[in-house]
Amino acid sequence: MKRKSIAPSKSPADPISPDPVSGVRDGDLPAYVSNGLVGLRIREVPLLAGVAIVNGFAGVHPERRIEAAAYVPYPLALDIGVGEAWLSHQPWAVDDLEQAYDFSTGELTSRFSLELMGNRLLVEVITLASRSHPALVLQETTIRSAKTAAIKLRAHVDPAGVRGRGARHRTATPGEDEPVCDGSLLWISEGNLSTCGIACVSRCESAEEGKSGGDWDWRGPLNTHYCVDAAANSEVRIQQIAALVPSVIHERPDEEAVRRVAEGARLGFQELRKLNQAEWKDLWRSRIVIEGARAEHQRLVDAAFFYLNSSVHTASPAATSIFGLASWPNYHYYYGHVMWDIEAFCVPPLIFFQPDAARSLLDFRRRGMEAAKSYARLFGRDGIQFPWEAAPLSGQEATPGAGSGAAHADHVSLHVARAFSLYAEVSGDQRFAAEVAWPVLAGVADWFCSRVTWTDRGAELRAATGPAEVPNPPDNDSFSQMAAHEVLGRAVRLGQFLGHRVPATWNAARSSLYLPRRSDGVIPSHDDFRANEEKGATPSPLAGIFPYDFPLSPESERPLWSSFWPDGRSISARRCCRRFIPCGQPWPATGTCPSSCSRKGTPNTTLPGSTSVSNTAWTIRTPPFQPGRSSPTSPACFQDCFSV
């Protein structure tokens, strides 16, 4: 695709959207539109079916035969016809392809021309996934005809290429004289692991003949037909709304999808679009602004913020995968499994951007507690051990094949426990801390103490890989040990705060953790580490410093940084310092945090109580903790200070 450069945003409230692209994708991936419950991969001709994923909908993977996220029929397909010529029959009649993604609203706009029966049609398509009504995805298509013509439209749910089967297909609404929507479909995944309900409604005001649906075959496609007598240079507009509900949320999901799409039809496309724009405007109040850096750095930060927030929602029943809900046949995308990256790197910022969504991610792990207990017992260990690759539906281990990562990458449980602790501390929700976070922290602490081997050197972690997955698991992965130091400390502090009797083994293990060191004092990645070994360049010990908080003196920290970046800038002080400061208490550099932090405050300015992260090159500013509609009370603010 060719890119058309655009100027960066001038308002601090406006993100930098990607440059518009033109032409065919070639090897590029299609656009990704998602709200955290429904994810779409949208082709450069968006009316042709792409890929649709629904959070929590799972099936048997066609190749690996494991539980995995599964495709559902594409809900926003549309065919355009003139006479006997249709877009779907001759897609090569398309030209002038353009796409633009507006990060400020989450809307994808696609344009193309289409030559049918000697008539040139100009087509514009707006596609979005509703954040205010997360079961809904929407599309508006505007067609301008160069000549007077009878334009045929066929809105349909396209199951082509999707493994699984339709179990129920309705175009009428039982007990109603008039159907409340165009129709509904109950889709069963391969392996019968779960079902998904899809309901759709469409509207084309200029269609003189009204609309007609195909109920000739209850197993057939769900489609609605229109015919419009369009004058030359006039516009024909069709709006489509589809609801998608997984069975993990509702046992009869097609019926619930009908109710959801009926509410969407009542509100209408434009109102839903306005509500979605308002949701994104609200989210962008938490935009991270880098002052003094080049525009491409801010562009990357905006893209990361957008895609992270696109991939999570309060309504997400199965957390999210490391690729969100973006899937395409070119790659396995880790089968939609939930892995340690989510708790280590996604939950902490989401506690501030979308606290309700962060809670939803943690709820997935909470629902998997029994599976984690059984998994620990399977290894002969105490407590709870979370799986390396958690299946989206069952929450159980689903690593394909021999599963070497599942057998030896034990650090995943530490990240999960830390994420629960962070949410409890930042939110100030004591009920969450006592009823939700404490069982997780206590279970992981018990597990870790049963996992280590006690030697004359201390508590050693034998045969455990860190972030660098290698065939032969080493002993005493330093990142895992540093993470355990923090998690055990958090478990002890929370237990004492709640008045529990903390097992002595937790403190004993924490104070006795064996951490390998070279003769020059540098902490290597693990025992017998060699820089030229497979994946030896992975700087995993640095992650023990940030985002983890392993205590090292500046004298010990400098050579550790230099061992990975010998030609880089020296670190003159501890790179990362993290503190929780309750609302209303003074901040070192920015004054006083307001007693009630809210997303409704003035965005993207040096707010009292905002985070100010500085080094010699640039400053990052973010607003303070911003509770959502159902966030816990008594929030606390979080500060990161960088010194380089």
List the predicted regions and their residue ranges.
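Acidic/polar, glycine-enriched structural segments that form the non-catalytic walls/loops
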Residues: K2-V33, L37-Y334
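Amphipathic, well-ordered alpha-helical segments in soluble domains
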Residues: Y74, G106, V412-A419, V444, ...
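Inter-helical turn/loop segments and adjacent helix faces that build the functional surface
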Residues: I151, V248-E255, R287-E291, F352, ...
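Active-site core of glycosidic bond-cleaving carbohydrate-active enzymes
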Residues: Y335-G368, R418, E435, Q481-H485, ...
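Helix-terminus loop motifs that line ligand-binding clefts
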Residues: V312-N330, D356-R418, A424, R431-E435, ...
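Acidic/histidine-rich catalytic neighborhood
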Residues: W447-R501
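Active-site-proximal structural scaffolding
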Residues: A31, Y71, P134, R219, ...
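Contiguous, well-ordered alpha-helical segments that form the cores/surfaces of helical PPI scaffolds
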Residues: T142, D302-N309, H332-G336, W340-I351, ...
